[in-house]
Amino acid sequence: MILSDWDIRVYLEKKLLVINPLFPDTIRENGVDLRFGYQFCRFKKDQNIIVDTARDPVDKTLVCEETDENNGIIINPLEHVLATTLEWVEMPNDLIGFVNLRSTFARYSLYIPPTIIDAGFKGNITIELIGGSIPVKVYPKQRFLHVIFARTSSPVYRPYSGKYQKQRGVTPPKPD
């Protein structure tokens, strides 16, 4: 079952769901909008770098930068950029979140891969943005994600406790 704005408010008031900071326009009709944080990371453009997904951390291949509301960051066509949410999110054990790009940003030719926030997850959300056909400039604090919450049929037996638990800022991929 998808949660309405009323249900989301109840979860927040009971502190079962945490979104911090919570802005007046965060809660929408059937989900919440999350904002860009201040940190962005992009992969170096070097044909000689090959990342071994079984062994290599990608820290050496990422260039991370902080920006502000005045300067923003440009996402170039076909560029993959990791972004973080401004908000810290704590999910209860009976909700999952379906993460979607707000249609405004899709209309600017950006897109994201399908993303789920697992029951029990705590942290900032790291999201991959993919540039479309034109360069697009984005800014911290812009609402860019829409998260739809769905209640599981029962609380999950094993809440999320993986390698991205309690991540802060942009968290690059970690080998398994």
UniProtKB/Swiss-Prot annotation:
PANTHER family: DCTP DEAMINASE. The gene is dcd. It holds the Pfam family DCD. Catalyzes the deamination of dCTP to dUTP. It catalyses: dCTP + H2O + H(+) = dUTP + NH4(+). InterPro entries: dCTP_deaminase (IPR011962), dUTPase-like_sf (IPR036157), dUTPase_trimeric (IPR033704). Homotrimer. Pathway: Pyrimidine metabolism; dUMP biosynthesis; dUMP from dCTP (dUTP route): step 1/2. It comes from the Archaea. One of its GO terms (molecular function) is nucleotide binding. Keywords: Hydrolase, Nucleotide metabolism, Nucleotide-binding. It is an enzyme of class 3 (hydrolase). Its EC number is 3.5.4.13. One of its GO terms (biological process) is dUMP biosynthetic process. This is dCTP deaminase. DCTP binds at residues 102-107, 118, 160, 166-167. It comes from Staphylothermus marinus (strain ATCC 43588 / DSM 3639 / JCM 9404 / F1). The active site is at 128 (proton donor/acceptor). Belongs to the dCTP deaminase family.
